[in-house]
Amino acid sequence: MQCVKLPVSVTVEINVLLLAVTALALFTRLYGIHFPKAVVFDEVYYGQFLSLYMKQVFFIDESGPPFGHMILALGAYLGGFDGNFVWNRIGAEYPGNVPVWSLRLIPALAGSFCVPLAYLVVVELGYSHFSALGACALLLMENSLIVQSRFMLLESVLIFFLLLAVLSYLRFHKARNSFFKWFWLVICGVSCAFGIGVKYMGMFTYFLLLSLAAVHTWQLIGDQTLSHGKVMFQVLVRFLALVVLPVIMYLGFFYIHLTLLYRSGPHDQMMSSAFQASLEGGLARITQGQPLDVAFGSQVTLRTVSGKPVPCWLHSHKANYPIRYENGRGSSHQQQVTCYPFKDVNNWWIIKDPGRQSLVVSSPPKPVRHGDIIQLLHGMTTRYLNTHDVAAPMSPHSQEVSGYIDFNVSMPAQNLWRVDIVNRESEKEIWKTILSEVRLVHVNTSAVLKLSGASLPEWGFKQLEVVGDKIYKGYQQTGMWNVEEHRYGRSQEPKERELELKSPTHSDVNKNLTFMAKFLELQWKMLTVKNEESEHKYSSSPLEWITMDTNIAYWLHPSSNAQIHFIGNIVTWTTGNITLVVYCLLFLTYLLRRRRKVEDIPQDSWEQLVLAGVVCLGGWAVNYLPFFLMEKTLFLYHYLPALTFKILQIPIVTEHLYIHVLRSSAQQKAFGGVILAVLCSVYMSYHSLSPLTYGQPALTSDKLAELRWRESWDILLRKR
């Protein structure tokens, strides 16, 4: 019982330096984040989606997966934001009901914690706490990172998860076999999933870590001290944590996203009819009570499965193709058939049995099956859908599609079409409303009814061209159609049938669509549907990022010279470029000399330098070079993940030079003086640019002109 008398004690180690830099980071990122109380640059973009999120309205953002929006929505939810604000312009004042501080809080916290994470990464790479402190100092005083952290933007959140993923993998790699070894591996997989879930750019660092893990796993396989069972276990756990877990989490983001956003929204028409029908208040409103099976006599609207260039419906109207086109080619002068991107009474067609004259559904209904031959009669003009060996107006390599008019010339009707249900489960599959994807094949010519994507001239009312494609091969969404609105025709009399076509369909049901079907469709749309790219005043090329030849004006006060710019610490950016070159020269020199059996540094220092290069130089490269291949509008802030890894490289190269290259005490003292001078210059640059970083105080025009350190920088000066 003597042990009971002993005091219970707990020993806790506190890294005071780490706590200090974390506190400083929180101060630099959180100080005055409610200012300005106005929309700042891309807040106008993310804010629109945030409002839709708060109202649980479906939307598509092709810029990235939904997890980033969920994070911003969490801040909005905690602040009590109801989504009622119109995000229509940069500089718009936030009313009192918009919790500005809460909306900007999570990005600011993420940006703050990037600083201690950088400290831990440098230490985990095997470098001194002094070097880690240097990395923190550079990040603390990096104006561009501060600006991007202080507003409702996602780059700081992305960088936080990337650094956490790198730190977790390094700790896993260095840990001995224990619970914490596998804990860090799981954290790495989770962080990678979060990073990718915020922005697709997270894939770059994920692939870097996967490559590093593959190399380490290959070395593990060659370890003869491990049994086959242990090797298999190690490989399996790595695969589960770094591949399977991120995939499951990525799917989970979309599952939550689609569960939360269940209401019809502004982007519905980009999705398939089945997807739209699954949203509350959207297509479901007009599809309730529709017959599921398409039958002879059915009145239908046919929507193209493809969303390119826009979703549209098979359409015809009382206007003919011109006798001759502008280029002198002749047409059939038949009635125009187009694809129209709006709901209209002229989108209705009647599916007719070629062997019967009746235009109504029989009792019982005779369903249309895969392989059946049909005629399509335009409901309002009673012209049959027709194609023939006449060149289409905008796509002369394809056949013209028309509503057949008998001009008493040697041009007989060719209006028979074969129904090919592409997603059928059996050869006798019945054509289903919304669910079936159908290819309509012309019986006479084997041409497929297809949306060409071209727009007709003024004579075609700028509607989209529909053609008969004789060289159609494989699965092409432009040649797939589905029945969206559907009713059983009941009237044989033309006047009564016209009234029937103009009457609304029934109202409010959900069509069941599995999560995986919705996920695959949404993911495909996000990757393929792009908004029209337009030149932006502040867009830039990756070559301009290296030397920061550009900046971005984020906000300007409506009456004073107070303004906020995305602009970096020019001393840090220049130093980073120099250390990248120095690292490459060092690496190549060591590599060539080691090839000649000359070892300038110990083996463990060489391995340390290589690993640091893979993480930092590799992190910079994978987050920078891919932008040269992208055809999209790019901005300077896209460089931030690469910049972060480049900054980590600076103290690493500095320490290596100090210890392994500069041998004498005099050289080291002189180099120490250079380091101190650079840090002072970094601070002076940060301090000078801080009015443009924080937006206050407002400077005079003369002071602003003095901050234009490069001719290419766009500093805003008010005209007197």
From Swiss-Prot:
Membrane-crossing segments per the record: 7-27, 67-87, 105-125, 127-147, 150-170, 178-198, 201-221, 239-259, 570-590, 609-629, 633-653, 670-690
One BP annotation, GO: protein O-linked mannosylation
Molecular functions per Gene Ontology: dolichyl-phosphate-mannose-protein mannosyltransferase activity
Primary location class: endoplasmic reticulum
Protein name: Protein O-mannosyl-transferase 1
Tissue: Widely expressed. Has particularly strong expression in testis, ovary, brain, liver and heart.
Organism listed in the record: Danio rerio (Zebrafish)
Assigned protein family: Belongs to the glycosyltransferase 39 family.
